[in-house]
């Protein structure tokens, strides 16, 4: 059922399709998830619960935590450029009341850990308020597909510059972070993350993978 949403998109996936793919009854589905929105919330919890871990593996342990943030947000933006169905899911996640609240709560804890040294007087509650703004920026950039004028590279640099400014990262350090991201093959990384995500979802929620994802 989760693969159906990830490969077809949120708005085009019906409850009937989810139930059929999951091979469960309507009553069982309603007891577990209540509605299609319940599936979205569970999907968001799973995806956002592991995104920082994936980014940490790519950035490595030797780099400051701000690099993990830059990699994680860059992967999100790259994923939405590679797969329109993932764009649909991410946009819905950042708009849906319960799903977006989970994102704010989960991400604000990470932001407090990462950017607390830059804003020592800020509490985790302050970072929650900042996350509402940065999540709005993320959704805005996700909703605008890249083209030959507004490339993915420009999108990443613009988003990171705005968000790192909001979190009081010094200009010299910002440049180092942006240079690091520019040297990554972020598209290839996003493809790898997408494949690993689908495989992890298959293991977590017990659905078969098509050959295109197994490869």
Show where each model-derived region lies:
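Solvent-exposed, amphipathic alpha-helical segments
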Residues: 3-7, 50, 54, 79, ...
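Helix-turn-helix
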Residues: 4, 8-38, 42
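Hydrophobic alpha-helical connector segments
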Residues: 42, 53-88, 94-96, 104-109
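Short, hydrophobic secondary-structure boundary micro-motifs
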Residues: 87-92, 172-176
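Amphipathic alpha-helical packing segments from all-alpha helical-bundle domains
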Residues: 92-146, 150, 154-161
């Amino acid at each position: 059922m989760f693969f159906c949403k990830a490969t077809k998109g949120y708005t085009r996936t019906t409850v009937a399709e989810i139930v059929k793919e999951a091979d469960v009854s309507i009553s069982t589905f309603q007891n577990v998830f209540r509605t299609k929105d319940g599936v979205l919330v569970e999907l968001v919890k799973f995806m956002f619960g592991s995104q920082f871990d994936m980014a940490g593996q790519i950035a490595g342990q030797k780099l400051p935590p701000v690099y993990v943030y830059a990699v994680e947000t860059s992967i999100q933006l790259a994923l939405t450029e590679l797969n329109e169905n993932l764009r649909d899911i991410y946009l819905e996640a950042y708009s849906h009341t319960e799903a977006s609240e989970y994102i704010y709560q989960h991400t604000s804890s990470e932001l407090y850990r990462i950017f607390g040294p830059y804003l020592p007087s800020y509490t985790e509650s302050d970072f929650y308020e900042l996350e509402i703004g940065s999540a709005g920026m993320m959704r805005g950039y996700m909703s605008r597909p890249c083209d030959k004028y507004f490339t993915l590279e420009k999108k990443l640099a613009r988003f990171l510059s705005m968000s790192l400014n909001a979190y009081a990262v010094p200009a010299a350090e910002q440049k180092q972070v942006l240079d690091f991201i520019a040297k990554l093959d972020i598209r290839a990384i996003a493809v790898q993350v997408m494949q690993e995500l689908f495989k992890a979802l298959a293991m977590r929620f017990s659905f078969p993978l098509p050959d295109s994802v197994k490869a």
